[in-house]
UniProtKB/Swiss-Prot annotation:
Keywords: Apoptosis, Cytoplasm. Its main location: cytoplasm. Residues 40-52 have a biased composition (Polar residues). Residues 1-67, 79-110 are annotated as: Disordered. It comes from the Eukaryota. Residues 130-291 form the CRAL-TRIO domain. This is Protein prune homolog 2. InterPro entries: Bcl2-/adenovirus-E1B, CRAL-TRIO_dom, CRAL-TRIO_dom_sf. It is found in: Cytoplasm. Pfam families: BNIP2, CRAL_TRIO_2. May play an important role in regulating differentiation, survival and aggressiveness of the tumor cells. It comes from Pongo abelii. SUPFAM superfamilies: CRAL/TRIO domain (SSF52087).
Length: 323
């Protein structure tokens, strides 16, 4: 639609000849004139010829570019919109992978974690025990009932359940097992108590070292040291006797006087009640073998005794042949 102009249509060259705009409004003019300008013809070609948008003639110099940021119209929040067109499908995929990389910590997993770790206080210091790594060795310490009057506990320590020293994580296992033994001992003992150390059926590679036993003794609470009435070692070997002899310099004479050696389970039953004491099968088998070997040795000594008459030997043989 053609729009008539009162002064005529201005050409692009005439726009440069416009008079300067007034600095004040003429409020006395009752019929102000409105001038409308038409856009110049623009060549949309990509070459830099005259009239093209890439031409240097259309580029404003830095002095001519004067933009007042405060006077620019910005869209309101209501006028804004989100572009939901061609989205990158990999963006959603990456965000989904990031959300899946951190799994939710469920209540069941929290309970399971509490079962795998136990927090104890030993020597006024809080310690954490890796219960998973010592699970196969928890039978090393057990409650064997009571003796005498009151709550005099019998604590059974079975060395045959100790870990093998050939394990790659042997020191880590023994460290956690040490904390478990000490904390369990404090829970089991209320008054006086005794320790029954089952040394039999334990290969050399499973025997605890001198440093480990020394640390156990030093970490035991003073109350537990005082209330310990007896330390019975069943089936003692020359190795355990040597270990205890080496520990005498740093243990008290009172503790040394509490150590007793017992060579058989029958001898142990004459000292304490055996009803609640769990004896491993390997130790029971060893005890039978030692008893048979002892009887055979006695018989051999009797037959080799020159003072024993032939009549006494015949009587002894007849007694053994009777059912």
């Amino acid at each position: 639609m053609d729009i008539p102009f009162e002064e005529g249509v201005l050409s692009p060259s005439a726009a440069d000849m416009r008079p300067e705009p007034p600095n004040s409004l003429d409020l006395n003019d009752t019929h102000p004139r409105r001038i409308k300008l038409t856009a110049p013809n623009i060549n949309l070609s990509l070459d830099q010829s005259e009239g093209s948008i890439l031409s240097d003639d259309n580029l404003d110099s830095p002095d001519e570019i004067d933009i007042n940021v405060d006077e620019l119209d910005t869209p309101d929040e209501a006028d804004s919109f989100e572009y939901a067109g061609h989205e990158d499908p990999t963006a959603n995929k990456d965000s989904g992978q990031e959300s899946e990389s951190i799994p939710e910590y469920t209540a069941e997993e929290e309970r399971e974690d509490n079962r795998l770790w136990r927090t104890v206080v030993i020597g006024e210091q809080e310690q954490r025990i890796d219960m998973k790594v010592i699970e196969p060795y928890r039978r090393v310490i057990s409650h064997g009932g009571y003796y005498g009057d009151g709550l005099n506990a019998i604590i059974v320590f079975a060395a045959c359940f100790l870990p093998d020293s050939s394990r790659a994580d042997y020191h880590y296992v023994m460290e956690n097992l040490f904390l478990y033994v000490i904390s369990t001992l404090e829970l089991m003992v209320a008054e006086d108590y005794m320790i029954v150390y089952l040394n039999g059926a334990t290969p050399r590679r499973r025997m605890p070292g001198l440093g480990w036993m020394k640390k156990c003794y030093q970490m035991i609470d003073r109350r537990l040291r005082k209330n310990l009435k007896s330390f019975i070692i069943v089936h003692p070997s020359w190795f355990i006797r040597t270990i205890l002899a080496a520990t005498r310099p740093f243990i008290s004479s009172k503790f040394s006087s509490k150590i007793k050696y017992v060579n058989s389970l029958s001898e142990l039953s004459g000292l304490i009640p055996m009803d609640c004491i769990h004896i491993p099968e390997s130790i029971i088998k060893l005890d039978e073998e030692l008893r048979e070997a002892s009887e055979a040795a006695k018989t051999s000594c009797l037959y080799n005794d020159p003072e024993m008459s032939s009549m006494e030997k015949d009587i002894d043989l007849k007694l053994k042949e009777k059912p």
